[in-house]
Amino acid sequence: MDTAGIRLTPKEIVSKLNEYIVGQNDAKRKVAIALRNRYRRSLLDEESKQEISPKNILMIGPTGVGKTEIARRMAKVVGAPFIKVEATKFTEVGYVGRDVESMVRDLVDVSVRLVKAQKKSLVQDEATAKANEKLVKLLVPSMKKKASQTNNPLESLFGGAIPNFGQNNEDEEEPPTEEIKTKRSEIKRQLEEGKLEKEKVRIKVEQDPGALGMLGTNQNQQMQEMMNQLMPKKKVEREVAVETARKILADSYADELIDQESANQEALELAEQMGIIFIDEIDKVATNNHNSGQDVSRQGVQRDILPILEGSVIQTKYGTVNTEHMLFIGAGAFHVSKPSDLIPELQGRFPIRVELDSLAVEDFVRILTEPKLSLIKQYEALLQTEEVTVNFTDEAITRLAEIAYQVNQDTDNIGARRLHTILEKMLEDLSFEAPSMPNAVVDITPQYVDDKLKSISTNKDLSAFIL
């Protein structure tokens, strides 16, 4: 697995995070240090490695300020497997619902996909060449071989040929004739020139097995995986365009070209050494004295999470995985509860605390303009596909930021997510009419913003429903 990302310095990691996330420098610094410590640990001898475990992080801040995005972008920067889970979705062991070990199994699934995607990219050219060869044969097929005439299984008792019931002659073909060879050469040339991309071709693909609906969520998933491994893969015929068929066939050939067992072992190691599990809404399982009935269940979930944070060996369909060196990031608003409401053992497993700042008007302005593909740039690009040019003035952007901030103050504070609703509502009419406005140029001014939003933003009841 490519580990170039893990060698980035904390400054380089923060710089990359700054391309997508505005502010929250303290949080960025702490996650960057946590990542760098992983690289430092990888350089130590085996004995020292076993003694050093990651320092888990607890992010505290309201929704929409960047907690999840910082963790997700960080994982992407270093190429680490990342999974986000919600603490409220888990139940105590013995109850119907997802048990806490499922987060580790989900992380391993992500790790396997990462490793296999990279290994497939290394054999992509060979797999595509095989796919093109198969496409030529599908577009110009040979004659099918005739089925064996030995249909009576008792015939072998009287000296006849022994039938091979396991052999499937359905796809076997006669050697191609000279005429077929000539046609295939022509088709191959046309494929290479891209002239047949929209032509239809029939291919066989593996049928997606149905789900079992008789068990609880977690038991259902494990039973389904076992059944899928035991049962033979069933294939169905589909008619698709050549360009789609090439992707399906190339992916299938790439699977055959890579060593699956080696990839699975590499994925398990990657999950163990580089895995990041983001546990959102951890404040919702914190206990307080207001509702003693629910506190028992919440404490049960916390106590189930604790062994995984301390280091447990979890069984997955790819093999066992140890959670001791995974990085866990807990996150929550902690409006009702406090970090000290978590059970003491769990508090001790999150030694690094970082409080994220609420967003001000200036932050909203920066979010709209600074990131690599900011919201403003996204909407400009979308409307440009309809040949409509949209220009946002600086004053209009400031006005949008002011409205977003005010609506957050007057209703629920959902942070930067408010900008999505504000922009979507403001550009609703333009997005609807854009196909009938080719080559139009639209200037978004403060007046335009107020015309579209002022009546809503000044009415608290309407704001709560619409924005």
UniProtKB/Swiss-Prot annotation:
Signal peptide positions on this chain: none
Q: Name one Pfam family in it.
A: AAA
Q: Does the keyword Cytoplasm apply?
A: yes
Record-linked InterPro entries: AAA+_ATPase (IPR003593), ATP-dep_Clp_protease_ClpX (IPR050052), ATPase_AAA_core (IPR003959), Clp_ATPase_C (IPR019489), HslU (IPR004491), P-loop_NTPase (IPR027417)
Q: List the residue ranges of the region (Disordered).
A: 149-192
Q: Where in the cell is it found?
A: Cytoplasm
- UniProt lists compositionally biased (Basic and acidic residues) regions at 178-192
What's a single GO BP term from this record?
Answer: proteolysis involved in protein catabolic process
Alphabetic keyword roster: ATP-binding, Chaperone, Cytoplasm, Nucleotide-binding
From the UniProt record, which GO molecular function terms apply?
ATP binding; ATP hydrolysis activity; peptidase activity; proteasome-activating activity
In terms of Gene3D superfamilies, this protein maps to: 1.10.8.60, DNA helicase RuvA subunit, C-terminal domain (1.10.8.10), P-loop containing nucleotide triphosphate hydrolases (3.40.50.300)
Decide whether keyword Cell cycle is in the record. Answer: no
Query: Where, by residue number, does ATP bind?
Result: V22, G64, V65, G66, K67, T68, E69, D280, E345, R417
Its Gene Ontology cellular component terms are: HslUV protease complex
The record describes its quaternary structure and partners as: A double ring-shaped homohexamer of HslV is capped on each side by a ring-shaped HslU homohexamer. The assembly of the HslU/HslV complex is dependent on binding of ATP.
The record's comment on protein family reads: Belongs to the ClpX chaperone family. HslU subfamily.
Q: Which NCBIfam families match?
A: hslU, PRK05201.1
Q: What's this chain's function?
A: ATPase subunit of a proteasome-like degradation complex; this subunit has chaperone activity. The binding of ATP and its subsequent hydrolysis by HslU are essential for unfolding of protein substrates subsequently hydrolyzed by HslV. HslU recognizes the N-terminal part of its protein substrates and unfolds these before they are guided to HslV for hydrolysis.
This protein's name: ATP-dependent protease ATPase subunit HslU
What organism does the UniProt record list as the source? Answer: Staphylococcus aureus (strain MRSA252)
